Amino acid sequence: MAREIDTLLRVIFTARRKTGALDLEAVEMALRAALQQAGAAGLSQLLQQQFPAESHVPCSCGGQARYKGMRTKPLLTVLGRTEMQRAYHWCSRCQQGQFSTDAALDVENTELSPGVRRMLTLVGSECSSFERGREHMKLLAGLEVTTKAVERTTESIGADIARREQDTIQQALQQELPVAVGQAIPVMYVQMDGTGVPMVSQELEGRTGKGSNGRAHTREVKLGCVFTQTKRDAEGWPVRDEDSTTYTGAIETAEEFSRRLYTEAQQRGWDRAQRKVVMGDGAEWIWNLAQEQFPGAIEIVDLYHARQHLWELSSKLHPSDVAAKRRWVMSHQHFLDAGKIELLVNRLRAWATERQELAEEIETEANYFERNAARIRYPKFRQQGLFVGSGVIEAGCKTLIGSRLKRSGMFWTVRGANAVIAVRCCRHSREFDDYWESRRA
């Protein structure tokens, strides 16, 4: 190995003496390739099973699998292509063979090492496309892989993360989760929102949408986050604790998502929180979930979402007069910001009487504010030092979901989208390293 590298260095220095120049980028890449090749050769030697194989090993069926010889398997590692040799055993009882070394090294049913699969999962979930992930693997790791390998590996690891999440959810439902011990948490927030992801046609059969043709083009990803707050800044504004935000989400029913979000909150120490806050927009499913899974929590409708209701109504009242639209919003937003919800509702209903052609739309908005009155007392929440905006989850929908799954020309299956979502939630919750540690356990 040292001889090949020494030869390469001699060639590089000879070329420099002749030309007086050095192409540093080319030298870097050449040396990396040589070092990887040398490392791959050494790793191949390490992966040749030297010790005598056992004549019999236990089989999962309860029988004994008999040694049938050594088998060679190609393996792509972070150092490049290698080969591993391991014992093969066959069970006559269940007619199944096994490579126990494959299981021990986490390379069962794959020719990609754990390190390579970790890299593929990272680029597959974080790059703008699986093809771009393939390009990154070649440039950054010096490894040639196919786009399909990036896609399949990302979906496989994502599906495994999602499966483990479901196991944890079942533990929570059966009250078998380990008790989250630790100090009391001053304030814990749960936020949730939904965002549509474009899907292939077979995932949309029988579903109606908001478009003019009534057909659905997306499926809703329900995303939740949990974070904590222990202090305010010098001006009294609440400050989210650094690195305290974790995410969970999937394309699933509201009932399934409620169990998911409950489990995440419990793992974060919901029962230790001195004040518990649930935040979201005005979607009915959010508040049904809050009352079912987080009874007694402070419920807050996102301030900017509530203001948006006024802007949308103003656009109907003054469709072509921008100045009048703004004046109308400012005169009514004052009541909202001051927590005078009853006055706001009365004002709106007076407008319903005056503008009969829009009475139904105005009454709908009046009912919205009346129904959510306890959730939009913003001066009260601010006095308590609480957040009144759900910017954390809205940013999560844009960055965690939108930036990867809502790009131009993308159409997903539910299975593929949920796998990528699982990986991205895991990574953005800083749990990706823990996941790979658990695979080695």
Question: What is each model feature region?
Answer:
Residues 50, 66, 82, 181-183, ...:
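Sterically constrained small-residue positions within well-ordered secondary structures
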